[in-house]
């Protein structure tokens, strides 16, 4: 029996306008009444996720910032912070390549490292008013998220490979969309965050259904017993799916949630 549903946001749960379809809130509420928890698992930060799900924000759990912010039952279970040394290594490596543009995030700010190009406008769906800086923030700033914009989309896989070769002892690099490379500490992923939520509720992997579309969902999809992948997903992600459902534009996640609810 499914006891928990975890879903990615962009390209998965959200529609083509990056909005939560209205029926989602009722589905989360009704599933919770039947004992099925819902987890938003995303690169977006915790406060932003709560804003997206405001009508049911207190009825669900969160794996935010790609696993560095984990909340269940309203409680903070884990918060991972990038070390100052690892941030400096990441900054120095990105400076080696003219097509890479680093962004660092704390809980409420986005810092653009020495860059004022057009990518600033699409930088962070959480916080469009980003701050341009010339060096990484001071050590008293708790960095919880990093992303790299590659302004040569056709080279994104090559650049992810190069970054992995340079910094594999520190980070994992996950292409997301056509321009972005998500950066996570080596031991952190959506899967590790979800594992903590599951442990809190006493839920096993074979009791979990997860939805995703991108490489930053791969570990989570491999971890759960019932991985469902979007029709618009990356090829490699589709290969590990138990089910390939419709696209986010078709509200396929919501349709699958409704089917589960009706089967309970």
Model-assigned labels for residue ranges:
Residues 18-34, 79-87, 128-130, 187-199, ...:
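Short, acidic loop-to-helix structural element flanking the phosphoryl-transfer center
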Residues 223, 227, 231-264:
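Asp-based, Mg2+/Mn2+-dependent phosphohydrolase catalytic module
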Residues 21-119:
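Active-site phosphate-binding/coordination module
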Residues 31, 42, 146, 221, ...:
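Residue-level signal for inorganic ion chemistry
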Residues 33-39, 58-60, 206-207, 222-226, ...:
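Short active-site oxyanion
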Residues 3-17:
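Asp-based phosphoryl-transfer active-site loop
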Residues 1-7, 26-29:
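Non-catalytic pre-domain segments flanking phosphatase-related domains
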Residues 99-211, 215-223, 232:
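Conserved acidic, metal-coordinating active-site core of Asp-based
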